[in-house]
Every structure is written in structure tokens, then in C-alpha cells.
């Protein structure tokens, strides 16, 4: 299992969390962006710079993501492509994209695009907050803990481990 990041619009605080989590859990982390990214030196962390172009980073992630991987993105069409490949998608604010919600999110995005195209000011998302950061951290930690192999209940217990039931 790997974590992929649509990194062009990903907040720095989220990237920093992901770097620490990758090292702590020995998880491969790949950041994809149209611009150069400086990432910490680690065999687990890599950055891929794609040529400038509409959806180039999204297309690469959608092509390479595998079932069971996690993708961090605020891009709804990318999240839909990720879910179609049986991977999971989480936005930088800690909200999961799910098969049950993705169609509604795509419809809402399309409607807002149409309104903006006709000159209506639809505003934008609220500023990224500390609450968003905490929500993301909690969801990431829960996902990472579900990925760890569970101890085998039939395996012999060491003397300093409590018995499992």
C-alpha cells in the first residue's frame, strides 16, 4: 500500500504530516506536481514533476494508483477515478470521498462550474484552518492503523504481552 499526493494545491502542513507519517509507518509516499517539489531525503518519499498541463498530475496518479492505496486530493474528478480503481481518497481537510458521495460531489462541482461560467460569484472554500489540519491528522492516523498487520491470535505470546482474546 502506498500514499499518493496531488501536491500542487496540498497545504504545506499536510505535506509535513505525510512526511512524518511515511517515516513512522514505513509507508511509500509519492507526491506529484506540475512544479518542482523539495522533499525530505528518504527512500520512502519521492516527488514526481509532470509537465505543465491541464490535469497532468491527476492523470499520472489515476494511472498509477493501485487498489488499497490512499490518494490525498481536493480534486473531485481525480477522487472519482481513484475510487473506481478500488483505492481510497481523502481530501486535505480530512473528508473521505466514498462511492456513496462521489456522484453528488461531481454534480455539485458541475453546477458550480456552470454558475461561474455564467458570471455568478460562487465564492470558494473557506481558508484552511487548524481544525482542518487536526481532522486530516486523525483520519490519516486511523487509515494507517488499519493498514498495519494485525497480530495473529494463535501466535505464541511473549511473557510481557497481555494475552489476546
From Swiss-Prot:
Belongs to the UPF0178 family. Residues 115-134, 139-165 are annotated as: Disordered. PANTHER family: UPF0178 PROTEIN YAII. Coiled coil: none annotated. It comes from the Bacteria. The lineage of its organism: Bacteria, Pseudomonadati, Pseudomonadota, Betaproteobacteria, Burkholderiales. InterPro entries: UPF0178. It comes from Paraburkholderia phytofirmans (strain DSM 17436 / LMG 22146 / PsJN). This is UPF0178 protein Bphyt_5655.
Amino acid at each position: 500500500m502506498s500514499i499518493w499526493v496531488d501536491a500542487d494545491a496540498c497545504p504545506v502542513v499536510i505535506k509535513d504530516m505525510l512526511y512524518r507519517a511515511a517515516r513512522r509507518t514505513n509507508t511509500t509516499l509519492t507526491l506529484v506536481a506540475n512544479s518542482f517539489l523539495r522533499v525530505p531525503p528518504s527512500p520512502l518519499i519521492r516527488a514526481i514533476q509532470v509537465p505543465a498541463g491541464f490535469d497532468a498530475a491527476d492523470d499520472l496518479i489515476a494511472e498509477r494508483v493501485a487498489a488499497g492505496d490512499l490518494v490525498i486530493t481536493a480534486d473531485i474528478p481525480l477522487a472519482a477515478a481513484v475510487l473506481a480503481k478500488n483505492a481510497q481518497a481523502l481530501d486535505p481537510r480530512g473528508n473521505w470521498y466514498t462511492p456513496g458521495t462521489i456522484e453528488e460531489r461531481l454534480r455539485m462541482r458541475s453546477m458550480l462550474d456552470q454558475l461561474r461560467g455564467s458570471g455568478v460569484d460562487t465564492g470558494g472554500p473557506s481558508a484552511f484552518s487548524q481544525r482542518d489540519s487536526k481532522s486530516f491528522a486523525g483520519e490519516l492516523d486511523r487509515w494507517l492503523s488499519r493498514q498495519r498487520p494485525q497480530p495473529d491470535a494463535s501466535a505464541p505470546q511473549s511473557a510481557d504481552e497481555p494475552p489476546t482474546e
